[in-house]
């Protein structure tokens, strides 16, 4: 039997590192308090004064001793847990991230550095060995520099492509010292195929795992030895990608950033609610506030969109038998707040089945330059012009004096969150 690994000339071979700042937010807070990150019992909690406040990060000790982790709620933290709660300081985390990224960039050029999230980055060091040594030597130098300058422990996954580097990071490097691991094509049977669950695999979610289970694929070995034609038939190009990923093959190139076409570029905001929202009016209010924020961003960039989408995440996903829903509609190109609110509310009511809501998002796609005003068949030109002027006036006031200087009436209703969230960085206090 031939396999995708049989012809090495067809395999992408680079020296890629996936670097993670271990429990980044919690580590920053530990260092602020003069505690070693591995010795601290700290949880960074958003909205700590609310029972529904979310844990954004927990120190390794906290995870191990109390099983506190990402998305643990405030009400789940018992009094007997000796956990120090810290308010997120996003502006400080961003500054630290910038400084740490500068260290990564000392070992490669910017084209081969790809920030994946605030605490995780990829770098390709294929052409850096003459200057800095082997993969392991480069990883060790990075770890030492970051720890010496910031006190942060970094873990490093090394692979011949981004997938292998990421899998090495998540499944081995993060678990024990020296916080490094290397996964290669020749180790696929002893690494990738030994992963216990499909949905633990990077790029396969729980829904896709269930669909794979339904056709007799229960682990990565099964996926690697499945009928590729069947995978393509069931999942399209995603099926092809999953098949190759199960063999450790990933053709991603860090130097080739995905630059979306203008019709695919979008603007959106999302929010995790601090409690279950069950009343339709309260959900409408939050949708309206988010739509207002998205419309403001569109106008700031002097663009408009013609596809509006809404995402709703349920609090009781198991009871509802699904995690929520998404819906979208095409409209005349617009960046008007009223248009986005009207569409968002319509889409919400078109699919909502009464289940409690915890996540809300609004997004606008198919973007074009806002060069002209689109006239409505249902409103007079005078009213259209007045609405445009109102939006522009609100934008100017907020630009000068901040978001809270002028808010729409619904932001004073029960369930509204925009006023409380105004001034936050990344949804949290700076």
Model segments located where?
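Acidic, metal-coordinating catalytic segment for phosphate/diphosphate chemistry
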Residues: 324-430
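Short acidic, glycine/serine/threonine-rich loops at helix termini
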Residues: 28-31, 54-59, 164-172, 236, ...
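Residues that scaffold, gate, or flank divalent-cation-dependent active/transport sites
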Residues: 1-118, 122
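Long, highly charged, low-complexity intrinsically disordered interaction regions
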Residues: 136-197
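Catalytic palm subdomain of template-directed nucleic-acid polymerases
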Residues: 123-143, 216
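Short Gly/Ser/Thr- and Asp/Glu-enriched loop/turn motifs at secondary-structure junctions
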Residues: 116-120, 158-162, 303-307, 356-359
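DNA-contacting surface of Y-family translesion DNA polymerases
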Residues: 5, 9-11, 18, 208-356
């Amino acid at each position: 039997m031939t396999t995708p690994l049989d012809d090495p000339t067809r395999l992408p071979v680079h020296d890629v590192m996936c670097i993670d700042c271990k429990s980044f937010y919690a580590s920053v807070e530990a260092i602020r308090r003069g505690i070693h990150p591995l010795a601290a019992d700290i949880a960074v909690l958003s909205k700590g004064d609310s029972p529904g406040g979310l844990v954004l990060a927990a120190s390794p000790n906290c995870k191990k001793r109390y099983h506190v982790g990402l998305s643990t709620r405030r009400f789940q933290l018992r009094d007997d847990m000796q956990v120090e709660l810290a308010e997120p300081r996003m502006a400080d985390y961003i500054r630290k991230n910038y400084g740490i990224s500068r260290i990564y960039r000392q070992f490669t050029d910017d084209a081969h550095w790809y920030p994946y999230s605030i605490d995780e980055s990829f770098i390709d060091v294929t052409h850096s060995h003459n200057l800095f040594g082997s993969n392991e030597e480069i990883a060790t130098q990075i770890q030492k520099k970051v720890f010496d300058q910031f006190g942060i422990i970094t873990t490093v996954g090394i692979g011949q492509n981004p997938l292998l580097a990421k899998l090495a990071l998540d499944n081995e490097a993060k678990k024990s010292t020296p916080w490094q691991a290397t996964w290669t094509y020749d180790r696929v049977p002893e690494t990738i195929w030994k992963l216990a669950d499909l949905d633990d695999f990077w790029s396969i979610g729980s829904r896709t795992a269930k669909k794979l289970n339904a056709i007799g694929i229960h682990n990565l070995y099964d996926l690697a030895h499945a009928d590729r034609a069947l995978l393509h038939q069931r999942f399209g190009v995603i099926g092809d990608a999953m098949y190759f990923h199960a063999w450790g093959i990933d053709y991603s190139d860090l130097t080739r950033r995905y630059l979306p076409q203008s019709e695919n570029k979008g603007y959106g905001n999302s929010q995790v609610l601090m409690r279950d929202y069950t009343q339709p009016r309260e959900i409408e209010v939050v949708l309206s506030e988010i739509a207002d924020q998205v419309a403001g961003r569109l106008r700031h960039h002097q663009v408009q969109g013609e596809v509006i989408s809404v995402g709703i995440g349920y609090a009781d996903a198991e009871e509802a038998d699904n995690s929520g829903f998404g819906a979208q509609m095409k409209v005349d190109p617009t960046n008007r707040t009223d248009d986005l609110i009207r569409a968002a509310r319509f889409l919400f009511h078109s699919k909502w089945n009464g289940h409690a809501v915890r996540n809300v998002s609004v997004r606008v796609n198919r973007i074009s330059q806002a060069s002209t005003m689109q006239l409505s068949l249902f409103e007079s030109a005078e009213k259209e012009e007045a609405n445009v002027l109102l939006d522009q006036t609100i934008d100017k006031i907020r630009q000068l004096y901040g978001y809270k200087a002028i808010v729409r009436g619904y932001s004073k209703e029960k369930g509204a969150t925009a006023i409380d969230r105004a001034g936050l960085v990344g949804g949290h206090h700076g």
